[in-house]
Curated annotation (Swiss-Prot):
GO biological process: flagellated sperm motility
Pfam families: CFAP107
Organism: Mus musculus
Keyword Cytoplasm applies: yes
Keyword Cytoplasm: yes
Entry protein name: Cilia- and flagella-associated protein 107
Function in brief: Microtubule inner protein (MIP) part of the dynein-decorated doublet microtubules (DMTs) in cilia axoneme, which is required for motile cilia beating.
GO cellular component, one term: axonemal A tubule inner sheath
Region feature Mn 2, mapped onto this chain: 97-109
Subunit-level organization: Microtubule inner protein component of sperm flagellar doublet microtubules.
């Protein structure tokens, strides 16, 4: 009986020596990994230097080339706003007629444009170009904005109105076809369903 009784060491279960495999992979983030990662500091004596800082040779008498900087900056920015939007120094509210509006609504009516164009052999173009003579007038307006503003600013009769209700108002009864209505009384030729 004395041989079967073994003494249990209490430290045996608390030490991880008896574990054969780890429960999780080393890539799994466990516990307070964010805080632990913040505490980590690499043991180095000096601040790390980048390759540029290591290989940089200072030139004390060097002056920056502002001309090449200006050229590269203007090349990256492209054409300025005034060259893209303004046309012959006209104010912007006078040439709002688009090419689509000119072609379909005004039917290419432009009194300033000559009737016939001539071929310019030096520039290899038909001159004058239509874009050189823009239509100077306010844009074509069919009253859509005013109609929508009148609808938007109208007094609200009820507070709970959806977009569907405001966009599609209810039609009057006279607008509906009478043939689509259900017959209120059964036809005399129809026999009632017998009930047993």
């Amino acid at each position: 009986m004395a041989m079967l009784s073994t003494s249990v060491v209490p430290e045996a279960f608390s030490t991880p020596g008896w574990q054969i495999e780890k429960k999780y992979s080393t890539k799994v983030l466990l516990g307070n990994w964010v805080e632990e990662r913040g505490k980590f500091t690499k043991a180095i004596d000096h601040t790390p230097q980048c390759i540029y800082r290591k290989e940089y040779v200072p030139m004390p008498d060097h002056r920056p080339d502002f001309v090449s900087r200006w050229y590269s900056k203007s090349k990256m920015e492209g054409l300025p706003y005034k060259h893209l939007i303004t046309h012959h120094q006209e104010p912007s509210h006078r040439y709002l007629i688009s090419t689509y509006d000119d072609h379909y609504n005004r039917h290419n009516y432009n009194p300033g444009l000559p009737a016939l164009r001539t071929w310019n052999g030096q520039k290899l173009l038909w001159l004058p170009e239509k874009s050189d003579f823009p239509l100077v007038a306010p844009p074509t307006n069919y009253g859509l904005l005013e109609q929508l503003q009148q609808k938007w600013l109208a007094s609200k009769t009820s507070l709970k109105e959806s977009i569907y209700t405001t966009s599609y108002p209810r039609l009057p009864v006279c607008a509906m076809s009478r043939r689509e209505h259900a017959i209120p009384v059964p036809h005399p030729r129809l026999q009632p369903i017998p009930r047993f």
